[in-house]
UniProtKB/Swiss-Prot annotation:
Family: Belongs to the vitamin-B12 independent methionine synthase family.
HAMAP family in UniProt: Meth_synth
Note on how the cofactor is bound: Binds 1 zinc ion per subunit.
InterPro entries: Cbl-indep_Met_Synth_N, Cobalamin-indep_Met_synthase, Met_Synth_C/arc, UROD/MetE-like_sf
Annotated residues for binding of Zn(2+): 645, 647, 669, 730
Name by which UniProt lists this protein: 5-methyltetrahydropteroyltriglutamate--homocysteine methyltransferase
Length: 762
């Protein structure tokens, strides 16, 4: 029996976020291209070395990237939009696709399945010449071999998932384009095999949600590839859910190994194996350590899983691996010594997960007695945190038990509420606003750091925040915005800020993960029962409102987003944690309202990303996600206007859910998706307040008034003007002041032009 340890992917960002800092230094011309490439190589090889030292046998190569692995694949295969043809160097083209340029919009960015990682959407254009433009996996494979003596496992995104994630083609064209991918994949795999690659991981996460016809179509492509590359050892890797519905066909694919997720797809994959077995001539790669959360594994449960598998499958060859790439977890917990012992002991970041894989390998190859001490330690750790006071609050249980049906709905329907709100708020047609945050300048970040390290006092920090708030209230008034925001200068992160002020949360010092490009986030850890403590946003919001006659929005992050952007305890259902957060936010919203705040925005940008991959599981998730939002927002008076915001999603999947949220106004990120949501609204009605983002805030370019006016014009073809709002795509925290002010001026002018046209036509 052969059993090996493997990893599917390692976090890119570096232990101290060296990767992020190198990228941003290069973009701001602080280092040249040679320095950039040299530093990136050092980081890349260090990651390989860490995995080697941890005892991982099959080390992923090619999972490292300068921005995004899907973008890497698009560039490699020649999926380069013609608008970037003026750029000649690899890095210029690559980063223009990712970030846009002065004259060209970036490629669309969207969520990687149901995670908080974002990928760059490949674009297909008519006449595109698909070919292997650059065999990057080969270069990196040879680099690891030469520099470190590591015979790694090249990792590539599979052809079917790649094309399914791309856009720009019709459904009728899909099969033809898919066949065109065979030749470059054959060349890629042939060259890797010729260079000595013992096993090549081909990621096909899309397989968890395909129809039977699609899986058969994918199989034919793999058969065509296998025919040309008969000797390459391929590991077909799935993750994020089970492949239960198509398992019977998938195990007949012409590959040597198949990787299955036994964490997020455990039940479905076990059901399929018990029904159909597993081929004796293939290796089963068992995703048994959670690659998406930060908790220590239950080693007893994992070993029980292997016992069950060994009795149900024909193969004797196994690979022990995480459920997915460790991209979604922080790198190492060793710096988190400030945490309580019970919490610290319960954590496992990427490096600890690698150690867990080696422990499991030892138990499987040498017997459980070889890790008896570790097993006992793990059992004690799990018992300690399960029985902790933080996870057993009677007040939280009582509040949950007391909930009634009327706690989940507003007193009046939208149409009647909105009329009352129009009278109270006195806003113009097509009101303008922003999504919430304004630039977190170097001065803002430095001052916050000085406050946190005790260099300046609480009072000095509060005075600084008030000064920034007043400055931006005046900017907004001068620009001519209708509904203002306080700017969120006191907040580092829209989830972390609330977590720091609620019971049940804890925070890491260095628990960073990549969100998109160089943007990293440090998700809170929800380890206990969540409960309200004190007002979280009252002081800053009320202060901002005192500075102006215009309406100032209260700004909160919604319960589902706080849930989906946190590392969540895994001992109770996510629904229950979401309800706990909603009850805490409900208290805060009531305090804002009683303090005179008449518009309150509860952002849910992550509502869509939490949806299960399989459509059959959507309804259950959407039901409790919507109920969580309603629980948080439904206790306000009819005259109080509730806003929400969403971004980067396939909204057509959740239009009904958006409607069910019963928000008075929803703002939706649309500019970067090049009008896809506008097309969705052509086929369905949305008769509540809505703002479709008129410019992409993720790019440094300042869009013209005419660009924004065009989006407004297109939007008004499908939206009722009396309910339509005009706003940017997202918050402006990451932009510079000199980018924000002219962009908002152009936006307000576009709104004025649109109002004038509507009045003329009327």
């Amino acid at each position: 029996m052969a059993i090996q340890t493997s990893n599917l992917g390692y976090p890119r960002i570096g232990l101290q976020r060296e990767w992020k800092k190198t990228l941003e230094a290069f973009w701001s011309n602080k280092i040249n291209e040679e320095q950039f490439l040299t530093t990136m190589k050092e980081i890349r090889l260090q990651h390989v070395k860490v995995q080697q030292e941890k005892g991982i046998e099959l080390i992923p190569i090619g999972d490292f990237t300068y921005y995004d692995h899907v973008l890497d694949t698009a560039y490699m295969l020649g999926f380069i939009p013609s608008r970037f043809s003026e750029f000649t160097s690899y890095l210029d083209v690559y980063f223009a696709m990712a970030r846009g340029s002065k004259d060209h919009v970036a490629s669309e960015m969207t969520k990687w399945f149901n995670t908080n990682y974002h990928y760059i959407v490949p674009e297909y254009e008519e006449g595109l010449q698909i070919s292997l433009k650059d065999n990057r996996p080969l270069r990196l494979y040879e680099e690891a071999k030469q520099e470190l003596g590591v015979d790694g496992k090249p990792v590539i995104l599979g052809p079917y998932t790649f094309l399914k994630l791309a856009k720009g083609y019709t459904q009728e064209q899909f099969a033809t384009i898919l066949k065109q991918l065979v030749a470059p994949y054959v060349q890629l795999l042939s060259e890797l095999h010729a260079a000595g690659a013992q096993i090549i991981q081909v990621d096909e996460p899309i397989f968890a949600s395909l129809t039977k016809e699609e899986v058969q179509q994918a199989k034919e492509i793999y058969e065509a590839i296998r025919k040309e590359v008969p000797n390459a050892t391929l590991l077909l890797q799935t993750y994020f859910d089970s492949v239960e519905e198509n398992y019977e066909n998938i195990i007949t694919f012409p590959v040597s190994s198949i990787g299955l997720d036994f964490v997020h797809g455990k039940e479905g994959n076990l059901n399929a194996i018990s029904k159909y077995g597993f081929p004796a001539d293939k290796t089963l790669a068992v995703g048994c350590i959670d690659g998406r959360n930060i908790w220590r594994a239950d080693l007893d449960e994992v070993l029980t899983l292997f016992t069950k598998l060994q009795t149900q499958v024909q193969t004797k060859d196994f690979i022990v691996q995480p459920s997915c790439s460790l991209l979604h977890t922080p790198i190492d917990k060793t710096e988190e010594t400030h945490l309580s012992t019970e919490l610290f002991d319960a954590l496992a970041f990427a490096n600890q997960k690698l150690e867990e894989l080696v422990l499991i390998h030892s138990a499987l190859t040498q017997g459980t007695e070889s890790i008896s001490n570790e097993l006992e330690t793990y059992r004690n750790v799990h018992h300690t945190i399960r029985s902790s006071a933080a996870r057993n609050r009677e007040d939280v249980k009582a509040a949950r038990t007391a909930l009634k049906e009327e706690d989940f709905s507003r007193p009046l329907p939208f149409e009647k509420r909105y009329k009352l709100q129009q009278v109270a708020l006195k806003l113009p047609l097509l009101p303008t606003t922003t999504i919430g945050s304004f630039p977190q300048t170097t001065e803002v970040r430095q001052t916050r750091k000085e406050w946190r390290t005790g260099v300046i006092s609480n009072k000095q920090y509060e005075q600084f925040i008030e000064k920034e708030t007043e400055k931006w209230i005046r900017y907004q008034e001068e620009i001519g915005l209708d509904v203002l925001v306080h700017g969120e200068f006191e907040r580092t992160d829209m989830v972390e800020y609330f977590g720091e002020r609620l019971a049940g949360f804890s925070f890491t010092k260095n628990g960073w993960v990549q969100s998109y490009g160089s943007r990293c986030v440090k998700p809170p850890v929800i380890y206990g029962d969540v409960a309200f403590i004190n007002g979280m946003t009252i002081k800053e919001t009320v202060y901002a409102q005192s500075l102006t006659e215009k309406v100032v929005k209260g700004m909160l992050t919604g319960p589902v987003t706080i849930l989906n952007w946190s590392f969540v305890r895994n001992d109770i259902p996510r629904k229950e944690v979401s309800y706990q957060i909603a009850l805490a936010l409900r208290h805060e919203i009531e305090l804002l309202e009683s303090s005179g705040i008449r518009v309150i925005q509860v952002d849910e940008p992550a509502l869509r990303e939490g949806m299960p991959l399989k459509e059959k599981d959507w309804d259950a998730y959407i039901t409790w996600a919507v109920q969580s939002f309603l629980l948080a927002t439904s206790s306000v008076a009819n005259v109080t206007q509730i806003h929400t915001h969403m971004c980067y999603s396939n909204f057509e999947d959740i239009v009904d859910a958006i409607r069910a949220l019963d928000a008075d106004v929803i703002s939706i990120e649309t500019s970067r998706s090049h009008g896809e949501f506008i097309d969705t609204l052509k086929h369905t009605t949305y008769e509540k307040g809505i703002g479709l983002g008129v410019y992409d805030i993720h790019s440094p370019r300042v869009p013209s008034k005419d660009e924004m006016y065009k989006i407004v014009e297109q939007s008004l073809e499908v939206c009722d003007p009396k309910y339509f709002w005009i706003n940017p795509d997202c918050g402006l925290k990451t932009r510079r002041t000199e980018e924000v002010i002219p962009a908002l001026e152009h936006m307000v002018q576009a709104a004025k032009d649109a109002r004038s046209l509507l009045k003329t036509n009327a």
